[in-house]
Amino acid sequence: MKKITRIGIGGPVGSGKTAVIEVITPILIQRGIKPLIITNDIVTTEDAKQVKRTLKGILDEEKILGVETGACPHTAVREDPSMNIAAVEEMEARFPDSDVVLIESGGDNLTLTFSPALADFYIYVIDVAEGEKIPRKNGPGLVQADILVINKIDLAPYVGASLAVMEHDTQVVRGQRPYILTNCKTGEGVETLVNMIMRDFLFTHSLQATQ
């Protein structure tokens, strides 16, 4: 049976997790990748509805599923990811020719990480408007992520944030782990992010699955 890569996408409330999914999905499809999308909210499925509206005509809405976790966001993707695992398995069974499942967590703090039982890799999204000190806070979510996305870079001059400082601090806390600066409104950095996903997640994981 084909192994479908599972990629978690986490980060604080409002950092742009949903926006990242909305901008990378069309590019993945253009490159021949068949995605599924699962979003998490605590008491609604609002993110799934938003993604369906944005990707209408691009991705079949049946391939977008909202999970109402009713619990702390990191609990639903780390301590007890059973609800999300069930959702992933359901979607994979319905669409077995898919290549990747994008699993968006609910918005949480810098401690959010994904259980390896749920995600093969994970991306952590922060945004410039949270302040340039965010990388220095050294939370496990942003430090351990396979890719760190620093989003909303256009807002830096409006909040007094230095992108150079954020990049320096990111390199200090993450070492050689990759990161990317993005603006989901203009598309800046998005193609590079997709290249990283294709190279580091999809291609590598597909090779491992066939060995």
Curated annotation (Swiss-Prot):
GO BP of this protein: urea catabolic process
Entries under SUPFAM superfamilies matching the protein: P-loop containing nucleoside triphosphate hydrolases
Any one GO cellular component localisation term in the record: cytoplasm
Biological classification of the source: Bacteria, Pseudomonadati, Pseudomonadota, Gammaproteobacteria, Enterobacterales
Domain of life: Bacteria
Full protein name: Urease accessory protein UreG
Entry similarity comment: Belongs to the SIMIBI class G3E GTPase family. UreG subfamily.
Record's keyword annotation contains Metal-binding: no
Protein transport listed as a keyword: no
Quaternary structure, from the entry: Homodimer. UreD, UreF and UreG form a complex that acts as a GTP-hydrolysis-dependent molecular chaperone, activating the urease apoprotein by helping to assemble the nickel containing metallocenter of UreC. The UreE protein probably delivers the nickel.
GO molecular function per UniProt: GTP binding; GTPase activity; nickel cation binding
Alphabetical list of Pfam families matching this protein: cobW
Sequence positions that bind GTP: 11-18
Organism, scientific name: Photorhabdus laumondii subsp. laumondii (strain DSM 15139 / CIP 105565 / TT01)
Coiled-coil residue spans: none
General function of this protein: Facilitates the functional incorporation of the urease nickel metallocenter. This process requires GTP hydrolysis, probably effectuated by UreG.
